[in-house]
UniProtKB/Swiss-Prot annotation:
UniProt-recorded name of the protein: Chondroitin sulfate proteoglycan 5
Annotated gene: Cspg5
Protein's cellular compartments: Cell membrane; Synaptic cell membrane; Endoplasmic reticulum membrane; Golgi apparatus membrane
Compositionally biased residues, Acidic residues: 274-286
Resulting phenotype, S123A: No chondroitin sulfate attachment. no effect on transport to the cell surface
Taxonomic source organism: Mus musculus (Mouse)
Positions of the UniProt region annotated as Interaction with TNC and TNR: 265-301
Subunit comment: Binds TNR and probably TNC. Interacts with ERBB3 and GOPC. Interacts with MDK; this interaction is independent of the presence of chondroitin sulfate chains and promotes elongation of oligodendroglial precursor-like cells.
Length: 566
C-alpha cells in the first residue's frame, strides 16, 4: 500500500508485524536453519530495523515525499536487478526498508537455491511469493561448484556507512558454502556425496575386524592363527608365510621345551632325615646324567606319527609322571621308566617297556640301557638303609641299626625309638598292676567282713549264763540280727522272752510251724542249713562245760546230737 497523502510522515511497520514476519520465515522452512543463521542474528536484524525507522522517516521528510505509485520497491531473486525507487529514497534506504519489512533480504545471498522474494517497501504487509526452485541437475551442479557472485550482494549484510548519502560498496567476495549445506532445497531426495579423487574409500566399522580371527576360534579353523601346524586342516590361506615356508615345530616339541628333564621327577618320595645327603646325591646324578642324555631322551620322546595329528585327538603326550610313594619303581608308561611289581610278587619278574625291550627285576631302562634301581636312585631306601638286589625279588632294603632305634618297612620308612618301646612296656606293666590291686582290695574286704562277724559271735557266747546255754541247742554264727522273737524250748512249751536267744528264733519257727507235737522233725531242716555254714559252726557248735559237774541228761543228749551232725 502507498502512503496516504503526499506530505504525511512515513511511519514504519509496527514491531509486532516484524516479529511475526521473522517467525513465519523461520517456521515455513523455506531456508534451512544453517543458512538462515541463529536466532541471535535474527534478533539483531530486528533491532537494527527498529533503529532504522526513525532515521529513515527523518531522511524521507527532508528529501520530500515521492509519488504514490513510485513508493513500491520490489526485490527479486539472486541475479535480478534492483527495482526503481523514488528519487527521494537512496539505494541504502530502500535496501534497509526492504530488509526491515520482509526480513528475508539477508537470507537471499546465503541461500543460492531460493526463489525470488518480493515485498512492498512502504507497506506493513509482507508477501512472500512462491520461489522458483532449481532443477535437480542444476542443484547438483551448484552443490559441487562454488556459487557465482550475485549482482545484488548489498543485501547479504548490513549496509556500509555512506558518505554524502551514497552507499560505499566494498569488493564483493564469493562466499564459501560448507559441505553440510550443499543440499538441494527444493528436491525430495538427498544429494549424493562423492569421495574425493586420490583418497581411498572408507569402509564401515564392521569390515575392520578380520574374518580369520573368528576362524581361529572355530573348530574347523583350529590352529589358523597359531603358526599353522604342518598339514592341519584349519590352515588359513589369507595369512601366507612371509618366508615362504611354514613353521616346522609341532605341539609335542612345545611340550618338550616347556618340560625339561629333571632328575627329581623320578624320586617317589623325599627323605626328611637326610637332606644334606640327598643334595650331594642329586649333584652326582646330574653329573652322571648330563646334557647328552637329555638330548638323547628328547630324541626318544619324538613321536613317529603324522605331523597333523596332535595330542588333542586322544593320543597320550610323552611327559614325565610322578610315581606314587607306595609303589616301588620300575618302568613308567610313555617313557623309558615304568612300574614293576612289588618284591612280594616273585611271579612277575619282568617288566616290558613300549619299545619291546625287557629288563630283569630290579633294573629299569634308562637311555637305552638297563640300570639298577639302587644305582639310579641312591635314596631308594630311607633312613640310611642299604639297597641290595635279590634275584626274582628285586630291590631289597636292609635297614640301619642304631642304639635304641629300629627301622621297619619295605623301604625303611618307619622308625621305632626307645621312647616308644619304653612307653609300651610301662603302660603294659601299669595295667597289670592295676588289675592286681583291684583284685587284692576286693578279696581283702570280703575277708575283713567275715572276720568281724565271727568276732561278734564269740563275744556273745562268752557271756552266756547256764540257763541260756541250756536253751541254746541250735546256736549258729551267721544269723542276722534285727528281731527279738520269743524262744521256746519245745514246740508245746510257752514262749520265753530271752535277749540272748535271738539266733534260735528263725529255726524255732521253722521247726514248730508244721507240727508242734513232732520233735523228731528238727533234724531235717537243720541239715540243710548246717551244711551251708559248716565252716563257721565248728567252734560255736560245742557248748562250754557246765560248772561243778551239774547238768541234765537231756542237755548232754542234745549236745551229742549236735556234734554228730557237724
Amino acid at each position: 500500500m502507498g502512503r496516504a497523502g503526499g506530505g504525511g510522515p512515513d511511519w514504519g511497520p509496527p514491531p509486532v508485524l516484524l516479529l511475526l514476519g521473522v517467525t513465519l520465515v523461520l517456521t515455513a522452512g523455506a531456508v534451512p536453519a544453517r543458512e538462515t543463521g541463529s536466532a541471535i542474528e535474527a534478533e539483531e536484524l530486528v533491532r537494527s530495523s527498529l533503529a532504522w525507522e526513525s532515521r529513515a522517516n527523518d531522511t524521507r521528510e527532508e528529501a520530500g515525499l515521492p509519488a504514490a505509485g513510485e513508493d513500491e520497491t520490489s526485490w527479486t531473486e539472486r541475479g535480478s536487478e534492483m527495482a526503481a525507487v523514488g528519487p527521494g529514497v537512496g539505494p541504502e534506504e530502500a535496501l534497509e526498508a526492504s530488509a526491515a519489512v520482509t526480513g528475508t533480504a539477508w537470507l537471499e545471498a546465503d541461500g543460492p537455491g531460493l526463489g525470488g522474494v518480493t515485498a512492498e517497501a512502504g507497506s506493513g504487509d509482507a508477501q512472500t511469493l512462491p520461489a522458483t526452485l532449481q532443477a535437480p541437475d542444476e542443484a547438483l551442479g551448484s552443490s559441487t561448484m562454488p556459487p557465482a557472485i550475485p549482482e545484488a550482494t548489498e543485501t547479504s549484510g548490513p549496509p556500509s556507512p555512506a558518505v554524502h548519502d551514497k552507499p560505499s560498496v566494498g569488493p564483493e567476495l564469493p562466499k564459501e558454502i560448507p559441505l553440510e549445506v550443499r543440499l538441494n532445497l527444493g528436491g525430495s531426495t538427498p544429494e549424493p556425496t562423492f569421495p574425493l579423487q586420490g583418497t581411498l574409500e572408507t569402509q564401515p566399522a564392521s569390515d575392520i575386524i578380520d574374518i580369520d580371527y573368528f576362524e581361529g576360534l572355530d573348530s574347523e579353523g583350529r590352529g589358523a592363527d597359531m603358526g599353522s601346524f604342518p598339514g592341519s586342516p584349519g590352515t588359513s590361506e589369507n595369512h601366507p608365510d612371509t618366508e615362504g615356508e611354514t613353521p616346522s615345530w609341532s605341539l609335542l616339541d612345545l611340550y618338550d621345551d616347556f618340560t625339561p628333564f629333571d632328575e627329581s621327577d623320578f624320586y617317589p618320595t623325599t627323605s626328611f632325615y637326610d637332606d644334606l645327603e640327598e643334595e650331594e646325591e642329586e649333584e652326582e646324578d646330574k653329573d652322571t646324567v648330563g646334557g647328552g642324555d637329555l638330548e638323547d631322551e628328547n630324541d626318544l620322546l619324538l613321536p613317529s606319527q603324522k605331523p597333523g595329528v596332535g595330542p588333542g585327538t586322544g593320543q597320550p603326550t610323552n611327559r614325565w609322571h610322578a610315581v606314587p610313594p607306595q609303589h616301588t619303581l620300575g618302568m613308567v608308561p610313555g617313557s623309558s621308566i615304568s612300574l614293576r611289581p612289588r618284591p612280594g610278587d616273585p611271579g612277575k619278574d619282568l617288566a616290558s617297556g613300549e619299545n619291546g625291550t625287557e629288563c630283569r627285576v630290579g633294573f629299569v631302562r634308562h637311555n637305552g640301557s638297563c640300570r639298577s634301581v639302587c644305582d639310579l636312585f641312591p635314596s631308594y631306601c630311607h633312613n640310611g638303609g642299604q639297597c641290595y638286589l635279590v634275584e626274582n625279588i628285586g630291590a631289597f632294603c636292609r635297614c640301619n641299626t642304631q642304639d635304641y632305634i629300629w627301622h621297619k618297612g619295605m623301604r625303611c620308612e618307619s622308625i621305632i625309638t626307645d621312647f616308644q618301646v619304653m612307653c609300651v612296656a610301662v603302660g603294659s606293666a601299669a595295667l597289670v598292676l592295676l588289675l592286681l590291686f583291684m583284685m587284692t582290695v576286693f578279696f581283702a574286704k570280703k575277708l575283713y567282713l567275715l572276720k568281724t562277724e565271727n568276732t561278734k559271735l564269740r563275744r556273745t557266747n562268752k557271756f552266756r549264763t547256764p540257763s541260756e546255754l541250756h536253751n541254746d541247742n541250735f546256736s549258729l554264727s551267721t544269723i542276722a540280727e534285727g528281731s527279738h522273737p520269743n524262744v521256746r524250748k519245745f514246740c508245746d512249751t510257752p514262749r520265753v522272752s530271752s535277749p540272748h536267744a535271738r539266733a534260735l528264733a528263725h529255726y524255732d519257727n521253722i521247726v514248730c510251724q508244721d507240727d508242734p507235737s513232732a520233735p523228731h522233725k528238727i533234724q531235717d531242716p537243720l541239715k540243710s542249713r548246717l551244711k551251708e555254714e559248716e565252716s563257721f559252726n565248728i567252734q560255736n557248735s560245742m557248748s562250754p562245760k557246765l560248772e561243778g559237774g551239774k547238768g541234765d541228761q537231756d542237755d548232754l543228749g542234745v549236745n551229742c546230737l549236735q556234734n554228730n551232725l557237724t
